[in-house]
Amino acid sequence: IEITSTGFNPATLEVKLGDTVTFVNKDNQAHWPASAMHPTHTVYPGSDIEKCGTADDNNIFDSCKGIRQSEEYKFTFNEKGSWGYHDHLAAGLRGKIIVN
């Protein structure tokens, strides 16, 4: 999924259980992809912004920091469902991952 100043492309992505999704920042500003809802990031099971900086931060749908231009954030989806996400640094930018 590419991240630009106008949002995520594609904004909605359908994947299979166990697939890894890569977010790539194509903007010159930092972006912070994370599970909905802003500001807690708790919609995806087990995710919570409060887990950033802990031993659990590699297991949550949260980059836990702004990623710079050309940097990537990867997350493997191990829960079926429709998972909203957003940019923590620009909360109006939103998308959805559908895991089948």
Each model region followed by its residue ranges:
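Extracytoplasmic copper-binding redox domains, predominantly the cupredoxin/blue-copper superfamily
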Residues: I1-N100
